[in-house]
Amino acid sequence: MSLVCSLSCVAPLPQTKQSRPSFLKLETCTLSLSSPAGYPNFTTGIRKHISYLFTEPIKLPRLAKSRILVSQESFTETSTIDMDWEDQEEIEDTGSPWEGSVMYRRNASVTHVEYCTTLERLGLGRLSTDVSKKRASAMGLRVTKDVKDYPDGTPVQVSVDVIRKKKKLRLDGIVRTVITLGCNRCGESTGESIFSNFSLLLTEEPVEEPDVIDLGFTFGNDKEEGEDDDDNDDSWIDWEDKLHFPPEVKEIDISKHIRDLVHLEITITAICDSACKGMCLKCGANLNKRKCDCGREEKDKGYGPLGNLREQMQQKEGLRN
């Protein structure tokens, strides 16, 4: 087997003040790969023959003067633009809108905490509509008086159990809310109830990303041992859910994790009702609200584009006669 590649290119050379622009031309580049018989893979026993042929630097003719007229005012000091990077950084660093919506405060005498916020406060206002608000009201979810930013938003209730360990705090909780999604059948807005569990581990020591990520699969005898120590071992918690919580700090923001949980519940398989009839694929009518006549149309009994071929041929023969 042999492979021959030929190319020709021009490469610039360093230019001095007293010399014109020079270029180095690469005439040919031939690469031959041969494989002896008996080797199924040509990469085994390859003999390489590479030859390069260079020529002397080629001096190009002097370039003609450009006829483009450049105004001298373009290079004046008054035309320069001053960039104030400090002001720009202050404008860009506006923070996240969901920061501070759910704050855990250290308290040694409290083992259960209840929080209430809204989808709008978490930066998920596009998932909040009248449909989600009515569904949440039917579930018994209400916006408390502590939420002053969006009192009419869709409520998000968070229940947290606090488990204290040596230099650690584990927060096991559940998030309850309703988000607005599009029905997969008819396309109308529908409310999707959310009951999502989460666990956070607050440690006094800084959290570092592990070199080896454990997927949580155990085999053989290790599986039984892992089940016995499941309640006392926090290794199953993802390192992204482990937060640094120094002892001198009194509160920590967990709003981002709550927001991520709601994001994970967004699905494209939401259905407004199990008896939803969907929409007509031809005219787009919502079959839950009205009926269409697309199904009553008579189907073509011919043979596709050749169904009327006989009639067309008879008409042509009649015209000829």
From Swiss-Prot:
Residue span of the annotated presequence: 1-32
Main location: plastid
Subcellular localization: Plastid, Chloroplast stroma, Chloroplast nucleoid
Job of this protein: Plays a role in synthesis, processing and/or stability of 23S rRNA. Required for embryogenesis.
Keywords of this entry: Chloroplast, Plastid, Ribosome biogenesis, Transit peptide
One annotated Gene Ontology cellular component of this protein: chloroplast nucleoid
Name listed for the protein in its UniProt record: Large ribosomal RNA subunit accumulation protein YCED homolog 1, chloroplastic
Residues in coiled coil: none
Pfam families named among the record's database cross-references: YceD
Cited InterPro entries: YceD (IPR003772)
Assigned protein family: Belongs to the DUF177 domain family.
Domain of life: Eukaryota
Disruption phenotype: Embryo lethal.
Any single biological process term in GO: ribosome biogenesis
Entry annotated with the keyword Transit peptide: yes
